[in-house]
A protein has these predicted regions:
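Conserved acetyl-CoA binding element of GNAT-fold acetyltransferases
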Residues: 20-37, 86, 184-196
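A conserved beta-strand-loop-helix scaffold within acyl/acetyltransferase catalytic domains
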Residues: 14-20, 129-194
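Acyl-donor-binding surface of acyltransferase catalytic domains
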Residues: 35-113, 248-253
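Conserved acetyl-CoA-binding loop-helix of GNAT-fold acetyltransferases
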Residues: 39-50, 199-216, 235, 239
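A short beta-loop-alpha structural element at the N-terminal edge
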Residues: 105-129
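A short helix-loop-beta-strand connector motif used in the catalytic cores of GNAT acetyltransferases and
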Residues: 1-2, 55-57, 82, 150-162
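Conserved GNAT acetyl-CoA-binding A-motif
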Residues: 54-64, 215-226
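Conserved active-site tyrosine of GNAT-family acetyltransferases
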Residues: 72-74, 236-242
Length: 256
């Protein structure tokens, strides 16, 4: 893990060469942002200045979903890709309402509730998005993504969603939806430089039946780190004791 810092901020990050090739500039994945002086608040301009001074044009940020202050600042930097990655534990879900953001809420487990409806969730903005201040980078990323999609999908099946910035109504990001489609999963995996593992949908599976299928992929030998839109299926993963990350992408967040 690398660090960049000045007299105000410290950013811990991992460098990703794959995205350098995609975007034509230095790209990092931010793991943590710390204030040098804890009395101060995290300021948008301070963060932007530190990244710019180090030649970073694109940053992916992994932030606990409950850290709303940092997310508020990061959302103002609308040319950065903003991601929340939260590790969920079954005992947390059973004991309290767990919020992932303004559109995402997991309600407590109720005794006698069927495991297929343990979680009641509302997702309005879900997918993978990229934000740019520079629309040339925007176009370059979209073209790269189209090339990848051509390998897996017919053109008519492309599910590209153009999102609009709520402030100025300019198109600032693209997204692809419905990761449960296998071909889309393969395309997404190549785009992100990650491994795609096909896991069957929950359906009427029990935990034991799910574990049997997971074993076919050798997944019990490694941590699962996949985006899951079907949260009841995520619950079964947790009951099996598999390490698991639930990922959502937040496109716009406003603090009232």
């Amino acid at each position: 893990m690398d660090k960049i810092k000045n007299n105000k901020l410290i950013i811990e990050f991992d460098h990703t060469k794959y995205d350098d090739d995609l975007l034509g500039g230095k790209t990092i994945r931010i793991n943590e942002i710390s204030l040098v002086n804890k009395i101060n608040n995290l300021q948008e301009n301070d963060l932007k200045q530190l990244l710019n001074n180090n030649g970073i044009v694109f940053a992916q940020y992994r932030i606990p979903a409950t850290d709303l202050k940092k997310r508020k600042v990061l959302n103002k930097l609308n040319f950065y890709y903003i991601s929340t990655v939260t590790e969920l534990k079954l005992e947390d879900i059973q004991s309290k309402t767990f919020s992932l953001g303004e559109n995402v809420e997991i309600k407590p487990f109720e005794k006698g509730m069927d495991e297929s409806i343990i979680m009641d969730i509302a997702l309005n903005n879900f997918g993978h998005g990229v934000f740019y201040e520079d629309h040339n980078l925007q176009d370059k990323a979209v073209e790269r993504f189209k090339i990848i999609l051509e390998k897996y999908l017919d053109k008519d099946d492309w599910k590209i969603v153009l999102l609009k910035n709520l402030a100025d109504d300019k198109i600032v990001s693209w997204a692809i939806w419905h990761w449960e489609d296998e071909n889309l999963g393969l395309a997404r995996a190549e785009l992100l430089g990650t491994k795609f593992v096909k896991i069957p949908r929950l359906g009427t599976y029990t935990a034991n039946a799910m574990f049997t299928d997971i074993k076919k992929h050798g997944a019990e030998k490694c941590d699962l780190n996949i985006t899951i839109t079907n949260l009841p299926m995520a619950t079964i993963y947790m009951r099996l004791g598999l390490k698991f990350k639930y990922s959502t992408e937040i496109y716009h967040y406003s603090m009232n």
